[in-house]
Structures are given as C-alpha cells and as structure tokens.
C-alpha cells in the first residue's frame, strides 16, 4: 500500500496539502484557477481529472461550471471525493482506476493530471502505458497536462544518504477531529532508478500537547528529467505545446532551452495529441 491508500490519509488529504502547498518551497497558489482556465480553453469536448485525489481540482471545476469526470487509483480517495461532491450537491462521475489502463468509455478534449499525480508512476514502463492511455482517451488534437519538477542535484545528494529513520519535520496541521498533527518524512533517492522512497510519519497530539497516536505511511515517487519528458511525449504520440513554470502564467521559451534555468518552480506540461 502507498500513502494515499490509507483511510486516515484520504480523510485529511486536503487539510495537510493546503498547508504544504502554501510553504515557500511548495508554492501552489492559484493552481485551481489555473486548471479552470485550461478547462475553459481546451475542455469543449469534455474533461477528466486523473489522479483526482479527494477532488481539489475536480470539485473546484464543477463549482465554476465545468462538470468533469474524476478517477484515482486509491479507492479511499475516490470515496472521500464522492462524499465531498455529494455534500455540495454535485452529481459527478468518480471512479477508481489505474491511469495506466483505465477505460472511461469515452474521449475528452482535456485530460488533467494535477500536482504530483504523474510522478507516482514508479518506472518508465508504467509512464509510457499511462501516456498512451491518456492519448487513447483524447479526441484528435486534445490536450494532456501533467506536472514534473526539476531534479535538483544538491537535494538528490542529500537524499542518497538518508536512512529510513532520518525524519525531518515537514509541517503541522489540524485534522478532521480537531487534533494537531505533525508530519515528518524520511525520503531517500536512488540515482539508478530515479526513485524517491521512504516514509511519512504522522504524530497526533491532544489538547495538553501529549502525543496520542503515531502512524507511518510509505510513499514512492519517480523523478523525471526535463529532456526525458520530451522523449516520452514524442514516443507516446504527443507534441509539447507549452511548459508553464508555476501557476501564474510564466512559460519557458521552447526555442531557448536555457530559459528553463530562470525558474525553480514545477514544470506544468501542456501536451497536444498528434
């Protein structure tokens, strides 16, 4: 099982991501508005949110007039997402599925894999299978958007020496029971597989400051290099239209590879089906 398969994680997912993505290193301000604009621009023949989690993008789109489908590998994530949609009186199609082989039974003009969804595929075989599956689900000229980040050698070098119990504090949030929870993680990096793996530790505290629960949850992600992504896109029937750097409209100049050096934010790929 992975981090996102656990009931306790799914029920608090948006709570701790809201904190994480507002930290300086993980700035994701405006990400929902960003995907709404993409949906307005490219979603005329339907939108699907792949790796939708508990609905941060999917529900935001629906509340702003874009009714999309949603799918996630985690049944727990789908369950929480469906409950949140029902609480908002939103009638959405949400189903469990693996992005490498799910069949939605229809095609779309926009496929969204937001935030780190694509990076949870642990090897190139699954990445290729997923990209080809997204291609099959798109109408001619349809758009796939997904995220990667620039692997950073200094961080990689540090993580290559990380031991399973070398926990570092990540954040603190308030869970769905009103309890303070501190999150620590210990992430190691394997340069031969490009895999980041390790554990997230969740410590829950009572009102007196006593730790009353501790849970360890595993997580595995694969780093994908920028030029590797260009080759994967080409191999799977896509052309790179744009690479946004963050959610404020900044874009790389695709005719000048050195333009990428100006940014430290995530790469948000806009891929067009050939």
Residue ranges and their predicted role:
Residues 109-125:
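A short SAM/SAH-binding and catalytic strip from SAM-dependent methyltransferases
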Residues 58-101:
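Class I SAM-dependent methyltransferase SAM/SAH-binding core
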Residues 51-55:
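Class I SAM-dependent methyltransferase "Motif I" SAM/SAH-binding loop
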Residues 101-110:
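A short acidic, Gly/Pro-enriched loop at the edge of an enzyme's catalytic core
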Residues 128-140:
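A short glycine-rich, Lys/Arg-flanked "PGG" loop and its adjoining helix->strand segment in the class I
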Residues 1-45:
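Conserved class I S-adenosyl-L-methionine
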């Amino acid at each position: 099982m992975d981090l996102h398969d656990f009931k306790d994680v799914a029920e608090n997912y948006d709570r701790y991501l809201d904190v994480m993505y507002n930290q300086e290193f993980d700035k994701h301000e405006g990400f929902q508005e960003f995907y709404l604009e993409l949906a307005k621009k490219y979603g005329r023949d339907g939108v699907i949110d792949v790796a939708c989690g508990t609905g941060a993008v999917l529900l935001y789109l629906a509340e702003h007039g874009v009714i999309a489908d949603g799918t996630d590998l985690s049944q727990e994530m789908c369950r929480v997402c469906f409950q949140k949609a029902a609480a908002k009186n939103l009638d959405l199609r949400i189903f469990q599925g693996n992005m490498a082989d799910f069949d939605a039974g229809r095609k779309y003009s926009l496929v969204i894999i937001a935030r780190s969804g694509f990076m949870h595929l642990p090897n190139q075989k699954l990445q290729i299978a997923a990209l080809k599956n997204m291609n099959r689900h798109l109408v001619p000229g349809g758009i796939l958007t997904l995220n990667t980040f620039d692997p950073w050698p200094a961080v990689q070098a540090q993580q290559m020496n990380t031991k399973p119990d070398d926990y570092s504090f990540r954040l603190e949030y308030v869970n769905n029971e009103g309890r303070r929870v501190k999150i620590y993680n210990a992430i190691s990096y394997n340069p031969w597989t490009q895999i980041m793996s390790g554990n997230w530790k969740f410590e829950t505290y009572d009102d007196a400051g006593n730790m009353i629960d501790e849970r360890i949850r595993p997580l595995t992600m694969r780093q994908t290099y920028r030029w590797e992504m260009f080759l994967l896109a080409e191999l799977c029937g896509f052309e790179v239209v744009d690479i946004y750097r963050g959610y404020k409209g900044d874009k790389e100049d695709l005719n000048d590879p050195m333009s990428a050096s100006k940014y430290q934010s995530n790469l948000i790929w806009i891929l067009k089906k050939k």
